[in-house]
Regions:
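Extracytosolic and intramembrane catalytic regions of membrane-associated proteins
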Residues: 132
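Flexible coil/turn residues that form the inter-helical turn or adjacent wing/linker of helix-turn-helix
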Residues: 57, 70
């Protein structure tokens, strides 16, 4: 194969051309936006935004247009950029990913890591969903929360979900990304303790993929704290649980079989009438990783 970096670049440019051919679907006013030939065409804007390095807009424009005296103004760029729907970049993201095969696997499996992080954005006290202020007399800041799926073997992002800073919910984010996961083949979702949830397990299972999630230890207030395990330091056991919101005599008499979920515990596949029970089977492994330190995973 030709130089891999050049191959990837060609696929990106092909994906951009595919987007340009459908630009009417990704503008705010399809009957008039980008219908005339101007310096800041739809294609030029897409490429320039992808090439930006985090400098000021004035600096980015000078660099992109090679310090031309006829380059567009910052105001013109902002106005033209506002005509492009965010869905344009979502389309480009997925089209580009699909254009390059997933050839790097781990023993036949695609390994998908899920995690989240805060992103600092421009300070704006009027942006209530994203503005944080520790004390009334202190200068505040703005944050977004980025959730992402990352292919560990291919070293590329497969999906992202951005949430307002004050509405961060990593449980909901991984469920949404699992629901819309478009790739076929053997796959394992991998996540840390912040994703320990029956609802997360169920969403991933129902997508037909596997998961491996680090969880709190057996003596904690987490999922394992409500399950009986062997009196050994390490173990590898299969667990069956029937989840329910009912509190019948049967449920109370058999805690080894049933797990009661209160109303404030999110689970999207239960209700008291049509779906009162939900069966789950999973494997719990407790590993010794140092002299006095253990880790637990559910898979």
């Amino acid at each position: 194969m030709k130089n891999y970096a050049q191959h990837v670049k060609e696929k990106l440019l092909e994906s951009i051309q595919s987007l340009v051919s459908l630009k009417e679907m990704f503008v705010m006013h399809r009957d008039k936006d980008f219908t005339r030939n101007r310096k800041l065409s739809f294609e030029t804007l897409i490429k320039q935004i992808l090439e930006m390095e985090g400098n000021t807009l004035a600096h980015e424009l000078r660099h992109y247009f090679s310090f031309s005296l006829n380059m567009p103004t910052v105001s013109a760029f902002v106005q033209r950029r506002a005509l492009i729907s965010p869905d344009a970049f979502l389309y480009l993201f997925h089209t580009f990913n699909f254009a390059i095969p997933f050839e790097n696997l781990f023993e036949g499996y695609r390994l998908i890591a899920c995690d989240g992080t805060d992103l600092n954005i421009a300070r704006n006290p009027e942006d209530k969903e994203n503005y944080f202020q520790s004390n009334p007399d202190e200068k505040g800041f703005n944050l977004l929360h980025l959730n992402a799926l990352y292919d560990l073997c291919s070293k590329r992002y497969l999906d992202t979900l951005i949430q307002p800073g004050h509405k961060e919910n990593e449980f909901r984010a991984i469920c949404q990304m699992a629901d819309r996961f478009p790739y076929s083949g053997k796959t394992i979702f991998i996540a840390d303790r912040g994703y320990e949830s029956y609802n997360v397990f169920a969403h991933i299972e129902r997508k037909g993929v596997n998961y491996l999630i680090r969880v709190k230890d057996k003596d904690s207030n987490g999922i394992l704290g409500a399950i009986q395990f062997p009196e050994t330091d390490t173990f590898d056991v299969d667990v069956h649980k029937c989840l329910t919101r009912k509190q019948t005599k049967e449920v109370k008499a058999h805690p080894e079989k049933y797990h009661f979920l209160p109303k404030n515990s999110t689970f999207d596949f239960l209700d008291l009438h049509t779906n009162p029970f939900y069966n789950m089977d999973f494997r719990v492994v407790r590993l010794k990783i140092s002299e006095d330190l253990y880790e637990c995973i559910i898979t």
